[in-house]
Amino acid sequence: RPRFTEPEILRTSLGAVVLHMLSVGVARTAEDVTNFGFIDPPDMKAVSDGFNELTELKAIGRKRGEVTLTHTGRQLARIPIDVRLGRMVIEAAKAGSPNLLASVLVVVAFLSLQDPRERPDDKREEADRIHNRYADETSDFLTALNIWDRVFQADGDPSNNALRRICRTEYFSWLRMRQWKDLVSQLRQMCKELKFKVG
């Protein structure tokens, strides 16, 4: 096992980093990103992969040899999650269904965070049995929506104390459920700023 964890910039997709650098104007080319002055600079292939990802997502284009943000890229730069998940938000907004967008926000927030389900060693079978009540065998996305609907929608938004009780009995991490709820709220606010209609 390595003595130190590899720096995050060397082990994750650079799409979001490249997008941010382009949006604030500190980079226009892959060379600008590579030469930026990171403590642990990424290699050229990782930077190139980041640009390719943004091209596939239609977040960037080229004008007179320079990389520019598209309308989609400017929207993505304002969404505080992985660029691929952010693109899901934009596509859901384009579909024109406020309820669809609300569901997508719940799913992308779930995918952005650590799974809130807990399986303590001494109660693994009980936790699995309880979690199976939320499961949809056709889709993990629908499972996430089931958890959200039953915890945060069924009886109204629970107080912190009520959420703690739910988490204790349903084997959810209270902290991760709070993070999920907070990220959904943040994404809903961002959608309003982008003039997306959320149900």
Language model region names:
Residues 1-199:
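Second RecA-like catalytic domain
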